[in-house]
Amino acid sequence: MQSKLVVAIWTILAIAVASVSAHAAAGAVYTESNSASGNVVYAFNRSEDGRLLSLGLGGYPTGGTGTGSGLENQGALAIDDANRFLFVVNAGSNTISVFRILDNSLSLVEVDSSNGKRPISVTVKRNVLYVLNNGGAVSDVDSIAGFAVSETGHLTPLISGLRLSGASVGPTQVSFNPDGDLLIVTERSTNSIDVFTVDQNGLASGPNVFPSAARGPFGFAFGKRGQVFVSELAGSASAYSVTRSGSLQKISGPIANGQSATCWLVLSADNRYAWVTNTGSGNVSSYTIAFDGTLSLLNAMALDTGSASHPIDIAVSNDARYIYLLTTGAGNIRGYAIATDGSLTPVTTVLGVLPSTTGLVAR
């Protein structure tokens, strides 16, 4: 019954916003249902003014299953550098789905094993993909696995079973650095940050394990000049520098925001601002970033999304003009225009989001 209601809502939305279909899409936004009965990608074309148009009524089936509940993760979906392929984790079936990105739709290429249990986060750089498996949540081990990505989107295993600092560490996100020669994984249960080095063949080694500046390192994003910015469940964010040899050193932090359950983090394209979602408080905080990577709190409540809104994933569009926010408690995706001073102005809201929905990526 719930799935029928969601399809009906998507149908109504598609009719309501059909007027924007006459204009060429400036980009797109993707999320996944994470439904245990069958995972689905929901896709939206983005117009020049930031509004979203639903594509594919009912979404695009991944050929895998989700868990039906939150994954406590960042990066459930990823787009390759050339905007050709969308990669999606299926945490319930231990698989990764590959979609070809078309102008107004998605086409499923294949479904592959994640070479581990409960995949929750995926990252891709050039022709190499890594997935983070939260096996510790299902009596297995936490690990990462790597794949080569062909020109047609086919995945070929490179390495698997590369363990984190322990068997069950509460991993949250895996991501490449901009050069593709490092991977970072956050471990919220051990308050640790793992750094893996990646050779020219895409093979990772490590990890080098470093203590987090505060409790519960969660989401993160790489900036410029070897800088990386991490959100922390304790209600704060910190900045680090990372070297090519895999060494991590704190620049500043933790910088408290006075909010609860600071989880997801995203940067502006010019690396002047960072935004974090405070899931427990129902709001978003903003930070400024200095040239040397030093973080300063800009606005503890840059957005008030509502006490029960449960804001989780957050993404910035490729043209750097818009932020999109997944609020599963409110059952919607919200879009905001980014001002030069880092403030955010509402431009769109899409309804019909399931509580289990996870991941948000924009182009």
Describe the predicted segments one by one.
Residues 143-222, 231:
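Solenoidal tandem-repeat scaffolds enriched in leucines and small polar residues
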Residues 328-363:
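Blade-level signature of beta-propeller repeat domains, shared across WD40, Kelch, NHL, RCC1
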Residues 44-52, 99-104, 148-154, 196-203, ...:
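Short loop/turn segments immediately following beta-strands, especially the blade-tip
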Residues 63-82, 114-128, 163-182, 212-228, ...:
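Beta-rich, blade/repeat-based domains predominating
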Residues 34-36, 46, 91, 134-136, ...:
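Short loop/turn segments immediately following the C-termini of beta-strands
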Residues 56-68, 107-112, 157-164, 205-211, ...:
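A short beta-strand motif characteristic of beta-propeller blades
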Residues 106-173:
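Asp-box/WD-like beta-propeller blade repeats and closely related beta-sheet repeat scaffolds
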Residues 28-32, 85-87, 129-131, 183-185, ...:
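Conserved beta-propeller blade signature
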